[in-house]
């Protein structure tokens, strides 16, 4: 989800069949026993255990959780490099069956024309995981809101989903997920507002962020009656937005220098007013503890997923690979809860890891605000 930088409140998730999480911020079943690319991870499952087979990448640089603070300047580089590595491997075998259908409002003037290209880039990165068969993207301004409602209805979705990115006469946010009813297509609504055209986040990172939300929920396709709801019920909110934002920012820009710039602006450019301006380790730890799956979606601090959650996932990526969090979602879809899946993926309990992450993320945010 994405949206306007001016608004620090989260857009309430709609009560329709696409119960995804969104924020009005700018800047905004994986198949067991499936062998994927040599440099990615896979899951092997029997009747009693679930085992994560680690990434095989002899030339990659990773850090252990205990090395995070000593490598505060290397963590973003290691994580960003791994996104590029996996993407470069995946495009050798591009998924040619996935279909993207774009619908653009009749009076909507797009300031960015590569929408499909960046949605596809997100899909290419995640192509070793369970995917929906199709992704529908609806792009519209407020004038075209009624059009969007009708288009969603005629495409088999619920028209009211079109309202999610809109507020106070402006459509500026974004919202994506997996539709409740079979065949569980991915669907995203993208508000278009000309004043957003100055925002670099809107030129690719947003699209990858949004399609990542759909891929997360797709891990429950074929497993749960309502994959999106099951994903929401399984995931802490910091992780839900963290995985999407880390992918969007890392894959949506062309160079590491651009990544560092947008990383800094995303973390420092939002929720800097109380109560969202305290990034002490104790406050971050409290945020982790209150990010309870199935409940946290309504929390007023949901927006912290775009900073604290994002930086936490970036650290996880530097520890175990840029696709490691999606592997964790695959484990959750197989029946494990978040804490079980986290320990299987990162070889440390969440209870032991979270105070270390809190210290690290606090230091990163302090550095970004003071640089």
PLM feature segments, named:
Residues 53, 117, 334-371:
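Beta/coil-rich, acidic/histidine-enriched accessory regions frequently appended to metallopeptidases
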Residues 125-141, 222-227, 235, 255-262, ...:
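Surface-exposed patches in mature extracellular/periplasmic domains of secreted proteins
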Residues 1-9:
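Bacterial lipoprotein signal-peptidase II cleavage site
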Residues 15, 20-52:
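Extracellular mucin-like PTS domains
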Residues 163-178, 190-194, 221-232, 276-300, ...:
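Surface-exposed intrinsically disordered loops and tails
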Residues 167-272:
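Zinc-dependent metallopeptidase catalytic helix centered on the HExxH motif
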Residues 268-351:
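Active-site-proximal alpha-helical
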Residues 52-200, 204-205, 233, 295, ...:
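Non-catalytic architectural context of zinc metalloproteases
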């Amino acid at each position: 989800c994405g949206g306007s930088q001016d608004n620090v409140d989260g857009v309430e998730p709609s009560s329709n069949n696409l119960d995804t999480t969104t924020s009005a911020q700018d800047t905004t079943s994986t198949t067991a026993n499936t062998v994927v690319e040599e440099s990615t991870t896979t899951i092997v499952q029997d009747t009693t255990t679930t085992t994560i087979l680690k990434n095989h990448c002899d030339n990659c640089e990773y850090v252990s959780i205990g090395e995070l603070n000593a490598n505060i300047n290397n963590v973003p580089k290691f994580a960003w490099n791994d996104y590029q590595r996996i993407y470069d491997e995946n495009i050798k075998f591009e998924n040619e069956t996935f279909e993207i259908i774009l619908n653009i409002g009749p009076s909507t003037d797009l300031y960015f024309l590569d929408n499909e290209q960046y949605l596809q880039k997100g899909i290419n990165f995640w192509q070793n995981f369970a995917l929906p068969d199709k992704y529908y993207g609806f792009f519209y301004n407020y004038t075209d809101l009624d059009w969007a409602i009708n288009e969603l209805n005629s495409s088999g979705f619920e028209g009211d989903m079109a309202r999610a990115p809109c507020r106070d006469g402006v459509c500026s946010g974004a919202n994506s997920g997996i539709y409740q009813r079979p065949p569980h297509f991915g669907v995203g609504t993208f508000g278009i507002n000309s004043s957003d055209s100055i925002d670099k986040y809107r030129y690719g990172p947003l699209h990858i962020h949004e399609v990542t939300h759909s891929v997360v929920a797709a891990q429950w396709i074929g497993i749960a009656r309502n994959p999106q709801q099951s994903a929401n019920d399984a995931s802490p909110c910091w992780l839900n937005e963290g995985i999407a934002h880390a992918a969007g920012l890392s894959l949506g820009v062309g160079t590491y220098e651009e990544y560092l710039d947008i990383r800094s602006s995303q973390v420092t450019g939002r929720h800097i007013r109380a109560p969202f301006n305290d990034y002490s380790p104790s406050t971050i730890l409290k945020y982790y503890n209150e990010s309870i799956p199935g409940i946290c979606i309504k929390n007023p601090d949901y927006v912290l997923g775009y900073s604290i959650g994002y930086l936490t996932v970036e650290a996880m990526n530097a520890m175990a690979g840029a696709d490691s969090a999606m592997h964790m979602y695959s484990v959750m879809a197989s029946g494990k809860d978040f804490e079980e899946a986290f320990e299987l993926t990162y070889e440390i309990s969440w209870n032991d890891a979270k105070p270390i992450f809190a210290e690290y993320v606090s230091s990163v945010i302090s550095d970004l605000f003071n640089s």
